[in-house]
């Protein structure tokens, strides 16, 4: 058994980022964690005799010379009433990088070892404080990209997914119990009712969960939105406007963006992966040509393209080519920018004459924000097919591990239904039902292997 699964030793890790900040949290867990920590805490006698769920003020002391290292607040937990189910100490110290190093070094000198990524959550699972669906929900909460995915993860943390999987499992178990009675007591078919309807209802519930994974992928992956156009048309200004901060360099010099810049923003619960591309033009050198080739590739792969045109200037050769080639492309929104300047009528008239869908043409100014609200409304309309209406109480599958097990369980149910139709022996039905129950048990962690747990928890961040 690997060190990852040993629970007899005492572990420590920084639970907050290793950066300068107002505060940091250093957490520890283990049977001897309180007594070991008390050796480096100024109020050690009070700590050793304290009850669980208590807070203590004092100083971390250097174990060699007794000097004060930092002023801290200590949260003390006693088994089994802690996250890990073990005695545990959480130290809130000042967020000094130097101080953090000193404190953790003192922990290590006192007999602790550095925790592996995810080891605290693993100990919570092994102590049956949480199931695997809750463990994965913790990971999803930490790495949520949008408000929607965060809320869905919180719902799973409350146990909603476990309850759903457990209900399906109980239905299969009821079916298995009825079949087992038939096999064990050799009763006739008419003497016992086999609840075949439970298999059909379980199939429907599994299908809903499987479909929910596709919904989650759409929410989590986001919509690829590419800003394209000739040099100095205002793409970078629009990029910064979407982000509500400066990420792209904005200047009056044409061609400031040589490759592309990527960032994300959220609109109405939908994640947008935004790309500010190099201006389309005849490149003078190899590096610029590579950037423009990448821009063209991004345009082809995007869910939505905003082609920005400087309406105060003449159209470029690349503008003419792009407009003519994409005038009927429904995923491209043509934006005439710089309407705060004197409008070039020939540019405006040409674009209006070519773009077949006039609603796909918007006039804006990134300088005074005129037309920006109309642009947002048009983006909402164009990506309405990406919009997924999900209630915060809906149960969504977001883990590839869970998805694979659900698909396996679903395939087993289809096989079981086929055998029921063919009226195969009941012992074969019982075997398939047992396999489905085991498969569902793997989702919640009631059935699990060390290799699966090792791989899953090591994807967690350190200190969690």
Curated annotation (Swiss-Prot):
Q: Is Metal-binding among this UniProt entry's keywords?
A: yes
**Gene Ontology MF term list:** GTP binding; GTPase activity; metal ion binding
Q: Which residues bind Mg(2+)?
A: 236, 257
- List the cofactors: K(+)
Query: What is this enzyme's EC?
Result: 3.6.-.-
Cell location: Cytoplasm
Pfam families named among the record's database cross-references: MMR_HSR1, MnmE_helical, TrmE_N
What keywords would UniProt list here?
A: Cytoplasm, GTP-binding, Hydrolase, Magnesium, Metal-binding, Nucleotide-binding, Potassium, tRNA processing
Q: Which residues bind (6S)-5-formyl-5,6,7,8-tetrahydrofolate?
A: 27, 90, 129, 464
Q: Where is the TrmE-type G domain?
A: 222-384
Please verify whether the record's keywords include Nucleotide-binding.
yes
Q: What does this protein do?
A: Exhibits a very high intrinsic GTPase hydrolysis rate. Involved in the addition of a carboxymethylaminomethyl (cmnm) group at the wobble position (U34) of certain tRNAs, forming tRNA-cmnm(5)s(2)U34.
Q: How does it assemble?
A: Homodimer. Heterotetramer of two MnmE and two MnmG subunits.
Protein name as it appears in the record: tRNA modification GTPase MnmE
Q: Which species does the entry assign this protein to?
A: Borreliella burgdorferi (strain ZS7)
């Amino acid at each position: 058994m690997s060190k990852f699964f040993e629970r007899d030793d005492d572990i420590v890790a920084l639970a907050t980022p290793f950066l300068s900040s107002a505060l940091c949290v250093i957490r520890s867990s283990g049977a001897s964690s309180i007594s070991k920590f008390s050796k480096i805490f100024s109020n050690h006698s009070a700590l050793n005799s304290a009850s669980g769920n208590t807070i203590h003020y004092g100083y971390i002391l250097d174990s060699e010379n007794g000097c004060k290292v930092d002023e801290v607040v200590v949260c003390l937990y006693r088994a089994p009433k802690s996250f890990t189910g073990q005695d545990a100490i959480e130290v809130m110290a000042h967020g000094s990088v130097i101080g953090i190093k000193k404190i953790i070094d003192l922990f290590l000198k006192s007999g602790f070892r550095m925790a592996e990524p995810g080891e605290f959550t693993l100990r919570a699972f092994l102590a049956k404080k949480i199931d695997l669906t809750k463990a994965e929900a913790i990971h999803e909460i930490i790495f949520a990209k949008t408000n929607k995915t965060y809320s869905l993860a919180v719902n799973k943390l409350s146990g909603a997914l476990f309850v759903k999987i457990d209900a399906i499992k109980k239905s299969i178990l009821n079916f298995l119990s009825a079949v087992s009675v038939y096999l064990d007591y050799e009763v006739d078919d008419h003497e016992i009712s086999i609840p075949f309807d439970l298999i059909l209802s379980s199939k429907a519930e599994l299908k809903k969960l499987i479909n929910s994974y596709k919904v989650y992928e759409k929410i989590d992956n986001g919509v690829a939105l590419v800003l394209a156009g000739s040099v100095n048309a205002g793409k970078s200004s629009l990029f910064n406007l979407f982000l509500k901060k400066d990420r792209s360099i904005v200047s009056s010099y044409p061609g400031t963006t040589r490759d592309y810049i990527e960032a994300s923003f959220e609109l109405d619960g939908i994640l947008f992966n935004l790309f500010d591309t190099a201006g389309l033009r005849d490149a003078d050198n190899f590096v610029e040509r590579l950037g423009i080739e990448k821009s063209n590739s991004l345009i082809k792969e995007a869910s939505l393209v905003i082609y920005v045109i400087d309406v105060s200037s003449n159209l470029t050769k690349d503008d003419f080519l792009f407009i003519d080639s994409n005038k009927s492309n429904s995923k491209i929104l043509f934006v005439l920018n710089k309407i705060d300047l004197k409008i070039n009528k020939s540019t405006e008239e040409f674009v209006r004459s070519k773009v077949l869908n006039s609603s796909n043409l918007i006039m804006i100014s990134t300088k005074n924000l005129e037309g920006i609200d109309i642009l947002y409304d048009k983006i909402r309309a164009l990506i309405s097919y990406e919009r997924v209406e999900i209630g915060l109480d809906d149960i969504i599958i977001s883990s590839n591990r869970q998805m694979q097990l659900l698909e396996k369980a679903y395939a087993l149910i289809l096989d079981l239904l086929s055998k029921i139709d063919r009226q195969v022996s009941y012992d074969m039905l019982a075997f398939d039902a047992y396999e489905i129950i085991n498969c569902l048990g793997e989702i919640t962690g009631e059935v699990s292997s060390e290799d699966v747990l090792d791989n899953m928890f090591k994807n967690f961040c350190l200190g969690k």
